[in-house]
């Protein structure tokens, strides 16, 4: 019996046809501080939130911008997540102050002490997604192990204060994400159309007050949404009446927000309709007993041979005018 051995050739194979995809700084890069990178690594975020966060970093720091207008479709293209899920994760990051929002612009918040990371409370990710996020515990203000946390002070929005129906949720329930919301801050939110109308109104305010401070657009959009859903107004009527108020001599300094527009809607509409009809609210009443108009009249130009002028004057009470005297005079040419 002869011992034979079969030699098998395990070569590296032919990889010449495969395209190598290697990252290179020449293709662009994002400058990120080590402190911020460590903070992101230690933040207890869901996989979806972290993917959206990285996408926002790419669209801002990747272009050397602190903030930029980022649509949900752009986030979906980078994260490979549905547009709706990207919107939900983005708004959650905004509520945690990890992402800043100014109108329709978004960007990373470099002030780590302002971050508010919710507690997971030992729940599974599937359960946690369906429950409310509690913002009681915030990101530590100092590095290292510490029990000191910074609680976020409640900011008072200067809109939606005109009534108790300013929002759809109680003040302490800040977690419910509205699927139709293009902007949301706590329980105040609005659709993309509401936000567009709010930005248009602020542009109108700046025409009469160029130094006006940028408002809380979530509160403005919330007031516009309430006018639309509860008062039955539409965006066109809101903008038309708001523009008239900004151009009116009296109302231009009194109606500078959607909340004020909603509060004064009836008065504004009445005054605008009177103005368009050519009727002013201060029109004097006609005095039927006033005969001052006769003075200075040249009676010789009358086409009649004789002109009889009868003047009735009230002798008794002005309200009753029961007793009266009548004087008749005859004038000739």
UniProtKB/Swiss-Prot annotation:
Name of the protein in its database record: Replication protein O
UniProt biased composition (Polar residues): 160-169
Function: Necessary for the bidirectional replication of DNA. It interacts with the ori (origin of replication) region of the genome during the initiation of replication.
Keyword terms of this UniProt record: DNA replication, DNA-binding
Family stated for the protein in its record: Belongs to the phage O protein family.
InterPro entries xref list: Phage_lambda_VrpO_N, WH-like_DNA-bd_sf
Biased composition (Basic and acidic residues): 123-132, 144-159
Organism whose genome encodes this protein: Escherichia phage lambda (Bacteriophage lambda)
GO biological process, one term: bidirectional double-stranded viral DNA replication
């Amino acid at each position: 019996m002869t011992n034979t051995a079969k030699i098998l050739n395990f070569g590296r194979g032919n990889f010449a046809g495969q395209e190598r995809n290697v990252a290179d700084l020449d293709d662009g890069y994002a400058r990120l501080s080590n402190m911020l990178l460590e903070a992101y690594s230690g933040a207890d975020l869901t996989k979806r939130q972290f993917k959206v966060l990285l996408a926002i970093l790419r669209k801002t720091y990747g272009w050397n911008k602190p903030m930029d207008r980022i649509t949900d479709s752009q986030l979906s293209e980078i994260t490979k997540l549905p547009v709706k899920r990207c919107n939900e994760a983005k708004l959650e990051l905004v509520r945690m102050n990890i992402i800043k929002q100014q109108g329709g612009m978004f960007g990373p918040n470099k002030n780590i002490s302002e971050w508010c990371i919710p507690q997971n409370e030992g729940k599974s990710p599937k359960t946690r997604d369906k429950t409310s996020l509690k913002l009681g515990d915030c990101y530590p203000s100092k590095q290292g192990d510490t029990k000191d946390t910074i609680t976020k002070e409640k900011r008072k929005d200067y809109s939606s204060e005109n009534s108790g129906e300013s929002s759809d949720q109680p003040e302490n329930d800040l977690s419910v994400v509205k699927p139709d919301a293009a902007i949301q801050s706590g329980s105040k939110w609005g659709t993309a159309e509401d936000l567009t109308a709010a930005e248009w109104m602020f542009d109108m305010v700046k025409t009469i007050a160029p130094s006006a401070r940028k408002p809380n657009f979530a509160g403005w959009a919330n007031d516009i949404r309430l006018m639309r859903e509860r008062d039955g107004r539409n965006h066109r009527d809101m903008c038309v009446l708001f523009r008239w108020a900004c151009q009116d001599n009296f109302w231009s300094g009194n109606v500078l927000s959607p909340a004020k527009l909603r509060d004064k809607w009836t008065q504004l509409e009445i005054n605008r309709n009177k103005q368009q009809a050519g009727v002013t609210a201060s029109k004097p009443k006609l005095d039927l007993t006033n005969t001052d108009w006769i003075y200075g009249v040249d009676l010789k130009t009358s086409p009649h041979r004789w002109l009889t002028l009868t003047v009735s004057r009230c002798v008794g009470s002005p309200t009753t005018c029961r007793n009266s005297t009548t004087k008749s005079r005859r004038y000739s040419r």
